[in-house]
From Swiss-Prot:
Protein name (Swiss-Prot/TrEMBL): Cobra venom factor
Region (C3d-like domain): 985-1263
GO terms under cellular component: extracellular space
Keywords: Cleavage on pair of basic residues, Complement system impairing toxin, Disulfide bond, Glycoprotein, Inflammatory response, Magnesium, Metal-binding, Secreted, Signal, Thioester bond, Toxin
InterPro entries: A-macroglobulin_rcpt-bd, A-macroglobulin_rcpt-bd_sf, A2M/Complement_sys, A2M_N_BRD, Alpha-macroglob_thiol-ester_cl, Alpha-macroglobulin_TED, Anaphylatoxin/fibulin, Anaphylatoxin_comp_syst
Anything else known: CVF has been used to study the complement pathways and to investigate the role of complement in disease pathophysiology. It has also been used to consume complement to prevent the hyperactive rejection of organs in xenotransplantation and for targeted complement-mediated cell killing. CVF can be safely administered to laboratory animals for temporary depletion of complement activity. Interestingly, it is able to deplete complement in serum from all vertebrates tested, except cobras.
Domain NTR stretches: 1497-1640
Amino acid sequence: MERMALYLVAALLIGFPGSSHGALYTLITPAVLRTDTEEQILVEAHGDSTPKQLDIFVHDFPRKQKTLFQTRVDMNPAGGMLVTPTIEIPAKEVSTDSRQNQYVVVQVTGPQVRLEKVVLLSYQSSFLFIQTDKGIYTPGSPVLYRVFSMDHNTSKMNKTVIVEFQTPEGILVSSNSVDLNFFWPYNLPDLVSLGTWRIVAKYEHSPENYTAYFDVRKYVLPSFEVRLQPSEKFFYIDGNENFHVSITARYLYGEEVEGVAFVLFGVKIDDAKKSIPDSLTRIPIIDGDGKATLKRDTFRSRFPNLNELVGHTLYASVTVMTESGSDMVVTEQSGIHIVASPYQIHFTKTPKYFKPGMPYELTVYVTNPDGSPAAHVPVVSEAFHSMGTTLSDGTAKLILNIPLNAQSLPITVRTNHGDLPRERQATKSMTAIAYQTQGGSGNYLHVAITSTEIKPGDNLPVNFNVKGNANSLKQIKYFTYLILNKGKIFKVGRQPRRDGQNLVTMNLHITPDLIPSFRFVAYYQVGNNEIVADSVWVDVKDTCMGTLVVKGDNLIQMPGAAMKIKLEGDPGARVGLVAVDKAVYVLNDKYKISQAKIWDTIEKSDFGCTAGSGQNNLGVFEDAGLALTTSTNLNTKQRSAAKCPQPANRRRRSSVLLLDSNASKAAEFQDQDLRKCCEDVMHENPMGYTCEKRAKYIQEGDACKAAFLECCRYIKGVRDENQRESELFLARDDNEDGFIADSDIISRSDFPKSWLWLTKDLTEEPNSQGISSKTMSFYLRDSITTWVVLAVSFTPTKGICVAEPYEIRVMKVFFIDLQMPYSVVKNEQVEIRAILHNYVNEDIYVRVELLYNPAFCSASTKGQRYRQQFPIKALSSRAVPFVIVPLEQGLHDVEIKASVQEALWSDGVRKKLKVVPEGVQKSIVTIVKLDPRAKGVGGTQLEVIKARKLDDRVPDTEIETKIIIQGDPVAQIIENSIDGSKLNHLIITPSGCGEQNMIRMAAPVIATYYLDTTEQWETLGINRRTEAVNQIVTGYAQQMVYKKADHSYAAFTNRASSSWLTAYVVKVFAMAAKMVAGISHEIICGGVRWLILNRQQPDGAFKENAPVLSGTMQGGIQGAEEEVYLTAFILVALLESKTICNDYVNSLDSSIKKATNYLLKKYEKLQRPYTTALTAYALAAADQLNDDRVLMAASTGRDHWEEYNAHTHNIEGTSYALLALLKMKKFDQTGPIVRWLTDQNFYGETYGQTQATVMAFQALAEYEIQMPTHKDLNLDITIELPDREVPIRYRINYENALLARTVETKLNQDITVTASGDGKATMTILTFYNAQLQEKANVCNKFHLNVSVENIHLNAMGAKGALMLKICTRYLGEVDSTMTIIDISMLTGFLPDAEDLTRLSKGVDRYISRYEVDNNMAQKVAVIIYLNKVSHSEDECLHFKILKHFEVGFIQPGSVKVYSYYNLDEKCTKFYHPDKGTGLLNKICIGNVCRCAGETCSSLNHQERIDVPLQIEKACETNVDYVYKTKLLRIEEQDGNDIYVMDVLEVIKQGTDENPRAKTHQYISQRKCQEALNLKVNDDYLIWGSRSDLLPTKDKISYIITKNTWIERWPHEDECQEEEFQKLCDDFAQFSYTLTEFGCPT
């Protein structure tokens, strides 16, 4: 019997890879093969000169059931017995949905040749690069983009590309296939998530993707840029020199900025910034340049122990203001490392292995602390007497002579900088390991490339050095070499060697294809067994593979002028252009496309992981990114990841603080501490505290208090304050002499942030150098800036080329820079500034005018222009402020014109100002889960989203509701919950009797089945599968010993045949047949036939005549319902073998039907959960069960099937239940069950747990198969919106589930949503509206708080005004509060005075513990003040200045909140606001509807009477809307205006108001016009007004009294009897009668 088993094993193993004798056959492939990519492989025969045909196959792994590629090649002596066939693996033939790594089997067969290698698969078949027109956008703007697609040969790819847009929250909002020749822009919505967005591009049906980023912010472009250049890239703690930062400020049109910079240094420790307050300095910016200095003494005074800062970073925060104070740019230089040694040494470019007795090239990479290359730094390895100096890329090569017998080599390298002491030099050590020769042969190969800067066009010398015994060297006839580039085998060649040559040199021509780097791998063979190899990594200078240049005239251009640029590039190239305002790059230049970024991305496709060489011959191939196998069983390790572990990133070559002090007084104190107590007095106390009260805060002792009081009283007697005020004289002048007429000035109005988004093809005939050129003509836009023209070309054969940016400088000698905020609030007064620049070398006199726009209230009116005239000095600028109040929501023009007297210089600018509603934007979020199967009625779910109740909405503002629907794909639960690496114990060699052998065979069968299905072989080892298959083959052959002639089985052949064991053999063999070739269908189907003919009863049940000896192998059969169990178990075996035996067993279908009918009768009466689960699986597998109610009723907690004290049986039974539900497609029930199974951490045993082991892993494998393929998501959703006649319909399926669908409506009405179908989705309803600001009065608990502000005079550089903010608080408890926070929200346009806050936190009489300023430019500034305590007995007061940096009127209040750090419920909030009565434009508002009120008041018409015809003529002018006789009922006051409430007594001329007599009317006038009007209560008046003075609101019309309003007192009836009024009354009567009866004359 044993001989028969051995024979069968040998027969089955035929066809598995075997060794050939007499020659060495080699197969080399890339270690990672890419789909849809032509890959070159190498097959070589050494020691064989017989021509032969080789078949090359690529199969799927692990089962090799599918041939993915095949070809045939001829190997012959003429070709050196070396062939390099090209293979290509179609992506559509392999799984792209798997979460696990995918592998393929590369197989070479031929006469005497059989080679096979499992190789990792990658889906990165090509590259996608995304270019956007800019890196930052505002809400509502379009995102323009291009996608460039190329393969690894840099050739154009024409595959379908999908482009997706994702919000900062990761929500997919757009997904479309794109035409690579034309791209539609993506339009950002107005209501959009701010932050960093992603554009993801990927090929259709490919998991690989490429991402580009852009920011969405509310921003305005700066007018100048600031660049900072530190004197060193590090701060050396032991140095003696101060640290300097050079500041360069340039306007974006190229001219230098004159102004001032405020510089503050600090240290960033982890994520916390700790400033150095004493470093705050004011630096003049002269001719655009300035220099800030951090003195070491200042640094040490803040951080006495600099050693504690090593490893942290220094930063410099710089704020630059222009001379006029009109503009400000804030920037920061960070990442300046604080170091004990200024350099770092890396060995990332150094091979870790050496060859004893041969030179070792040690490449040292030296960087600055920020990671940038450190050039010109001497380095030395003293032990080897080798030294060198780094090149510009930071590298230096040291040649080390290695002893002959060295096995390891400790190497220490240090910098040798002359200015550093030895202990501060950078030092780095490594240990290199000797290359291990194969079998200790002592044969070596050393490949040396000594050139440093390598570029295309060079001829590179490559040296092959050999060392070994004489006999071996005689056998070397040639070297085989491979050149790898971008992860592919680029070239294969041979270099001959003559006898006696220890050094062979070849020249390698460097072509552009080898950019950005390549690997040179070489090897030779010794005999027919040994391979000796070496490799080296070579960097190539980054350039375009082709050519692209943008040329222009390099002249300064005028805005709007015509100009030309010339494109020069490769013939046939397609060039994409864009011109970007340089100001955009000041805000964000992170995402700009560049050639370096392209090469950095491409270089990541190099699958090599070291700088060259290797631990041994196999290590050389592995580290270079190659897979090798030979006929002598030399095999590289299995690669399990496409990417290498990443070492250190390779850097491609790529308020003024003014301190008043009285030094003489302080000098009286010799003691340094007491002197400081005196000096701290000199700082003015913002609170105005007396000297005695200030002394209470001193904690340094009585001596300090005494010194403080003495100095304080002295200073109080001598201090004086000088205040100066500066005014800007603005005049109105109607003099036109010498100025260009405004109508002749054409305003500039086109100010895009980017433009020239064009694509041009270079189709022109090339010149003698092979360069094609194209000249483009265009008109510049109106911006005065520098346009950066970016050009990116794509050539089918030379890939992508990014040209050097070409800059177009645009300016005028005299121009306006109109600076406006991103948006302003309706009815909120704001100042805009026009900066007039004079670049003429002489003084000029200028007139500037703000043009009238009815959408604004301003000094310019319809009838009177607002002009100012003033001089501007030569080569200087002047800021002119204009105050406006926007009255209407939307985009409105602001236009300024200016001209120079007696000159032809003029300019005009018209820009759009965005006006947003009042209030604060709020959102209400509602989330609805759509699950029609669970929540619907009759399969349809109906949801009605009720209209919102928005009681706090600002009247007449829009409501916007967004409905976002996103599918919920069914999640995979199992993932890697079952760790495949823990199945090692199941791969065993079967042995023993017929039962024991099957127990042991089932283990590798189920392990292989599970690991195949879940693709987890790499966790156990790819090579272990061959071992497992061999064990299965062994078990199969062993079981044949126990097979009887009738195909039944028993533990021994002399025992009676077992029904259960025979069914078990059928089941396990049927499963094994899926994984192992050679398992005969006769063997499987013979067992099926025996079971049907010999063991099935007439009623369909199966019986057992000979129970197995090993009862535990049967699992849960023990107990009641054994006949049902056996029938169900055998039925499962029949069903699982049906695909094999259906054509060979005629009675199989009828047998299955009989067994099924038997089980159906028993199923609902079963008592045991175990039997119920097994029977349910058998019936479901036979397609006879689709109702899960009985099955689920037998469960415990609906997630497992439990019987008392039977854990492994419970696992087995639960596994049957899971299989049953999967067969019934009840996928929604499976999740909890899978979780229960995986939570058991059950990895099985071979004895006592056989069935539980087999069934658990079979069920989990089936779940892995079923869940990704069923993709049970097919939802139809209908949305009925109030403003749409046609409902909106969406269909959500598995492929588009993650795409967020958004629909919007502006009507606040009910929305109806219906969903039907299968699956789930999430519906998010977002309602946005503007809510009225509400001050919650007296929001106080445990704190008293009083806040006030007062105007102060201050002459601060850059500040437009100042307020003193006074905060007084007291704790209302019985004792003082402990740590307390004061959170201050600043007024819009104001910043805190840093000097005041510093004084409050410093000095011996410090009032606050510390403070923080949150200066987020997109929001209001916040100041956080920390107090150690707040008194419960007296007020604690803080006074500090807040400085106005830009004008905002009608601003919203600021707030002050005080609260306990330890009890957030103890808090108090108060609001503060500057005086509203000063400097505000006149406007009249009813609710939120406002009108601009003119400067001139109307007055009561009574001085001179006009005759009736003239009066009728005036009343009938076209602009007059109404004529009434009214009675004044009362006078009210509102918001600083007078409200005259009148009753209409008579309608003389009908106006807009259809029924004016129905109710009283409000006539509104400015308070200042009260005296001029002099209206009296109960008097009657004739009144008319123009249509433009009506103020309609939702339910009424109010009337504004302006200079256009006619008001005349109408005498009472008794007064008309008097002679004085008779004529007037007659005229009024005639006037009224004429208009009433006859109307206005036509």
